[in-house]
Amino acid sequence: MLVPAMRFKDSIEQQSYLKSASDQGHLEPVFEGLDVLSSTPWKINRKVFDVVLESWNNGDAIADIPASEEKMDYALPEKPPSKENDPQARSIYIERVKGVMAAQRRDHAERCKFNYNIEIARSYLNDTFYLPHNMDFRGRAYPIPPHLSPVGDDLCRGLLTFGEKKPLGKTGLKWLHIHMANVYGFDKASFDERARFAQDHEADIFDSADRPLEGNRWWLKAEDPWQCLATCFELTAALRSADPEAYESSLPVHQDGTCNGMQHYAALGGDVRGAKAVNLENGDRPADIYTGVADVVNQVIKADQAAGHEMALLIPEAVGRKIVKQTVMTTVYGVTFVGARDQIAKQLIAKGGIPQEHVYLASAYLAKTVCPISERREVKLMTRY
């Protein structure tokens, strides 16, 4: 099957840029990069797969896998006695019913997705396989297979390991410790602090590897639990080997950029302050622009609540970075108000704490608050351009 090197939706402009780059010979390095990615061998992490399969067959909710439908309670709310005569009570009841039904559909879709990825992993259990890549209109490379891939969710990343192994060496062993801290969620500290975090939790790491479902389940408290479990298995095997630095590892150590769109603005504009905010400049510990935006949002919410703003009063507690992260990231790509509202609503529902009938209004208020703050920061990054 012939697949284009770049994904675009019938855009004549994008096609013309691509043709111009090809005519000038500028695509050869790009093709070489895509060839490297496409020729990288992959395997399924058998230890992680066995835990995933046992958890799936039990039907219990674990990590980000919802429980099976027979173990979930999707009880509809009780009808208020005044439902027919009180429009407000009726509206609230309808919104809560919609929330329950939406949760049921969402969990069913999630289980279907997990089941599909598990079956793909099962089919490749004993094989080495490859993931052909192409790129989007921005030049970002992605695997062509849309499901089980190293750019997928936590489960996908936890299930995948490189098809070839290499000795860790001193640097590799340290990075394995740092990776453990990163996937656990301790990623805003210096590299040395992150390495010490993993060393301090060595007993928990061993317990997670030896008894993932019967032990203290430390790995389940991680931000990325399946990647954490994979790292527990790998780090345990390395540290228990005769020479940890000589241990041959195949575990991918993921690294991620900070708000790539704003990184481009900072680089194009030669903006040192902006570069520091998105980790293009060296620093003792990572900067976190998402927490910075969340802090400003919380200041606005507090001021609005003090002034008796009805929408602000719907927000019961401080907004965390996770609520604003996706909206901040997509501001530079032109996210609309409706898109931002939907992004925030999804996070509010996942977090809980806000009644279903208030989610729409609360997410609309937060979108109106977050977008201008993100845009102001974007403009600051562009001021020297």
Question: Model regions: which residues?
Answer:
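Non-catalytic nucleic-acid-binding interfaces of large nucleic-acid enzymes and RNP effectors
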Residues: M1-V328, V332-Y385
